[in-house]
């Protein structure tokens, strides 16, 4: 792995966050538990929404797609992480690393864009309730989701193709658990200025513009809520947005901890922040959305009761 320029057929070594066998065992069980909780939580959300016709609304349509994205997101990284934590062979092929990177970038982008669309849905529901049914028609919902997928696929494809132009020299040891773009760029020995430029340009378009849109949407939502005369009405309106606002804060907070810093200062200590957005956020989303949501509680109850009844009969 050391010395010289290396071809596309070579491998990277994912050394993880620690080389201590004891710490690796702890990390294995921790990530396995988090993965199982994430899968269970997101699958239950998807099944509850799809099985209950009362939840066939734009808000829950996008929530189900967000859960699907989170499910795919953790499955892209955690299984390989678990294998590496239990194995002496920590190699990942060049093609495997780029494939993992592509899905990582695409799914983070998809999460971000779906959150922006969900903010628009809440804005229309609270600020323009009389026009909600026509404004958020099934056709528009499918169109918005399709655009989210198109932009996400393109974003991941652009940066993955740019990564194929990067030359890696010397050690290909990645002191982390999966192929993350900043760690890969730190191993480059060729000129990566174009990667920086495109990353900044596309990042502003894909992340900062949706963030600005969400901030503007919630500013209008807050103004609309403050104009509601009754305290009960204010509470009900705010409760429909609180969970989404919490998820947005968690998503952008952890993402900002990783990417809002110069590439040269990026180090393994920042891997904790990467774990936050790559593992913790997808795990927490189902709990945040269902914590005080009576509709989700009811749908989950009916789903589980139906499964139990089927077993009895």
UniProtKB/Swiss-Prot annotation:
User: TM spans, by residue?
Assistant: 26-49, 58-79, 101-120, 140-158, 197-219, 237-259, 272-291
Ranges of the Cytoplasmic topological domain: 50-57, 121-139, 220-236, 292-313
Residues exposed to the Extracellular side: 1-25, 80-100, 159-196, 260-271
A Gene Ontology molecular function term of the record: olfactory receptor activity
- Domain of life assignment: Eukaryota
Glycosylation (residues): 5, 195
Kindly provide the name given to this protein in its UniProt entry: Olfactory receptor 1D2
Q: What is the lineage of its organism?
A: Eukaryota, Metazoa, Chordata, Craniata, Vertebrata
């Amino acid at each position: 792995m050391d010395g010289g320029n290396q071809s596309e057929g070579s491998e990277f070594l994912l050394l993880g966050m620690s080389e201590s066998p004891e710490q690796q065992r702890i990390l294995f069980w921790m990530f396995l538990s988090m993965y199982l909780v994430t899968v269970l939580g997101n699958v239950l959300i998807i099944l509850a929404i799809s099985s209950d016709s009362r939840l066939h609304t734009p808000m829950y349509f996008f929530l189900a797609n967000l859960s699907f994205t989170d499910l795919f997101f953790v499955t892209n990284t955690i299984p390989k992480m678990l294998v590496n934590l239990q194995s002496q062979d920590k190699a990942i092929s060049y093609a495997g690393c780029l494939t993992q990177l592509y899905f990582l970038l695409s799914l983070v982008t998809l999460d971000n864009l779906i959150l922006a669309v969900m903010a628009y849905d809440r804005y229309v529901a609270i600020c323009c309730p009389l026009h909600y049914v026509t404004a958020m028609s099934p056709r528009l919902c499918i169109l918005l989701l399709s655009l989210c997928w198109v932009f996400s696929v393109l974003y991941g494809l652009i940066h993955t193709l740019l990564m194929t132009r990067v030359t890696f020299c010397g050690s290909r040891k990645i002191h982390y658990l999966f192929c993350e773009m900043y760690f890969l760029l730190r191993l480059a020995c060729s000129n990566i200025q174009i990667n920086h430029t495109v990353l900044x340009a596309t990042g502003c378009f894909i992340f900062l513009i949706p963030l600005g849109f969400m901030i503007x949407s919630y500013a209008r939502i807050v103004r609309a809520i403050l104009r509601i005369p009754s305290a009960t009405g204010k509470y009900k309106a705010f409760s429909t947005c609180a969970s989404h606002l919490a998820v947005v804060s968690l998503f952008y907070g952890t993402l900002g901890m990783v990417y809002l810093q110069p590439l040269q200062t990026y180090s393994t200590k920042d891997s904790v922040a990467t774990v936050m957005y790559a593992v913790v956020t997808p795990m927490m989303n189902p709990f945040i959305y269902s914590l005080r949501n009576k509709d989700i509680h009811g749908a989950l109850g009916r789903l589980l009761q139906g499964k139990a009844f089927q077993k009895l009969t």
